[in-house]
């Protein structure tokens, strides 16, 4: 899907694919990718072996470029590391660093809102490699579409889209879903 949209430098990682492109590609990826839950835009890379280093590195980011005092934010963390045992703790330390950055610089802080924040921030740690990203998708991409209410699906929509892509089906013939009730 990403290649068809014009993405460059594709690299497959653990539960993710990274790519490069311009802002137009970012919008296209959010609109067209059926096999993605989120499209993240990396803003800072660093190495860390403990939560204190994460805090110090996150605090180095010029957060006013991405977040203002009147906006809300939430942190999502994904951890694949023996050095970090608890993803929520990493999320809390990331949040603390952002809040402390604003307090030290502006004497005020933006609010945290877990549900429907203005800005989703993701921290991904693989071993000691850390990436801070802005979530360009907002709500999970599987929730886009015309349906007002979502019900439990027997198969994750993103997984189903990936399976169909692997079959090579291009929509030129009928598609029969034997699992459909």
What are these regions (language model features)?
Residues 91, 95, 99, 156-164, ...:
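Hydrophobic, well-ordered secondary-structure segments
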Residues 121-134:
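C-terminal edge-of-domain segments
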């Amino acid at each position: 899907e990403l290649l068809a949209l014009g993405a460059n430098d594709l690299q497959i990682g653990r539960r993710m694919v990274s790519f490069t492109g311009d802002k137009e590609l970012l919008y296209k990826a959010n609109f067209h990718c059926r096999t993605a839950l989120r499209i993240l835009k990396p803003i800072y890379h660093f190495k860390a072996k403990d939560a204190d280093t994460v805090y110090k590195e996150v605090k180095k980011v010029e957060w006013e470029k991405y977040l203002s005092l009147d906006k809300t934010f939430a942190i999502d963390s994904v951890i694949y590391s023996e050095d970090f045992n608890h993803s929520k703790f990493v999320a809390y330390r990331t949040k603390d660093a952002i809040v402390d950055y604003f307090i030290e610089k502006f004497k005020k802080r933006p609010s945290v809102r877990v549900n429907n924040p203005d800005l989703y921030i993701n921290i991904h740690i693989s071993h000691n490699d850390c990436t801070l990203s802005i979530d360009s998708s907002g709500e999970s991409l599987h929730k886009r579409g015309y349906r007002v209410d979502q019900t439990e699906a027997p198969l994750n929509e993103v997984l189903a889209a990936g399976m169909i892509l692997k079959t090579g089906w291009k929509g030129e013939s009928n598609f029969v879903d034997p699992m459909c009730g």
